[in-house]
């Protein structure tokens, strides 16, 4: 038995260090299908379903795996998913949960990362474009035999951008998906706060808050076709400003114990990654440079830094660590709001 255990260990290590390191790749399906190294965060699925909040907002710093986790949730819940993507991952051991929920829901997925503009009108157009792309992803509704003629006409208008009621667009798409599938909808909204940050920078914050409040109010509050929703962002914007009246609304931040290990890398995960690539002797450097965060009860490393450092070590075992995160996206948003509050 010991011989087989050792053999299995070396086989796993060999397979791991032949995997590519996913620098900048935030698509779960791409990582799993194209042979990239993946640190398993699928326990988040189990935690969400066992906690079952109607609307959950996760706030974490930039470059901590929020978008990848949202992509993972989409791949798990969406009808028609490739279930083999989850083979060998934590969640696959919970067979009952997988049987009940994997590939069982229509999903609306929006990333608001690209919503920006020097004035409100251009930012609103960008938001409309992002919503239009998601509507187009569900093009099959145009010829659905389940929908009525009136429903299909409405969808065609939405598809061609002829329905200018942007605030009701997500709820309306939810309704059509529900009627088509006979199943309530999962809504995933990534980087929800980016439009507000860009608006704050460019002087149209009040207008954008009003628009987002209306959009979220229809999609998350008065939406009878909603199964549950998950949002991510860097900041917790005041509930009174855009989440007014939402029932069963949960905010999970860096001080909360729940989900504290699901965004960012734990100490054990970093050690295993370096061991898998035969660079375990550089663990002290990784810990000194990148173990600077404490979420809930967990010490957490910035994934962006760790992955970039590991990639450098693969080609150059003596590579020096550096602050990769500073050269990527930063958290300027936080500083701007703090500076404004101090004035």
What are these model-predicted stretches?
Residues 2-343:
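Phosphate-binding site recognition
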């Amino acid at each position: 038995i010991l011989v087989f255990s050792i053999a299995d260990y070396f086989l796993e290590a060999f397979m791991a260090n032949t995997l590519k390191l996913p620098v900048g790749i935030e698509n779960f399906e791409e990582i799993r299908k194209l042979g990239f190294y993946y640190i398993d965060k699928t326990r988040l699925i189990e935690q969400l379903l066992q906690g079952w909040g109607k609307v959950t907002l996760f706030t974490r710093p930039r470059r901590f795996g929020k978008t990848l986790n949202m992509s993972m949730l989409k791949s798990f819940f969406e009808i028609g998913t490739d279930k083999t993507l989850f083979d060998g991952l934590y969640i696959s051991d919970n067979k009952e949960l997988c049987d009940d929920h994997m590939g069982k829901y229509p999903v609306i997925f929006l990333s608001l990362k690209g919503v920006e503009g020097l004035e409100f009108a251009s930012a609103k157009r960008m938001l409309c474009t992002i919503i239009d792309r998601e509507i187009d992803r569900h093009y099959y509704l145009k010829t659905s035999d389940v929908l009525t003629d009136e429903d299909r006409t409405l969808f065609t208008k939405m598809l061609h951008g002829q329905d200018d009621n942007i605030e009701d667009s997500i709820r309306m798409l939810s309704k059509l998906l529900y009627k088509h599938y006979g199943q309530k909808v999962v809504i995933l909204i990534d980087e929800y706060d980016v439009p507000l940050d860009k608006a704050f920078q460019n002087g149209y914050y009040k207008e954008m808050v009003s628009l987002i409040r209306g959009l979220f109010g229809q999609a998350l509050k008065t939406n009878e076709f909603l199964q549950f929703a998950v949002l991510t962002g860097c900041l917790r914007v005041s509930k009174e400003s855009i989440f007014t009246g939402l029932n069963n609304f949960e905010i999970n931040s860096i001080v909360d114990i729940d989900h504290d290990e699901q965004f960012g890398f734990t100490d054990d995960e970093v050690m295993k990654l370096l061991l898998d690539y035969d660079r375990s002797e550089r663990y002290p450097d990784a810990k000194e440079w990148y173990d600077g965060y404490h979420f809930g009860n967990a010490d957490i490393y910035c994934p962006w830094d760790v992955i970039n450092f590991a990639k450098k070590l693969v080609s150059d075992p003596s590579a020096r660590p550096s602050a990769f995160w500073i050269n990527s996206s930063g958290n300027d948003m936080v500083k701007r709001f703090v500076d404004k509050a101090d004035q």
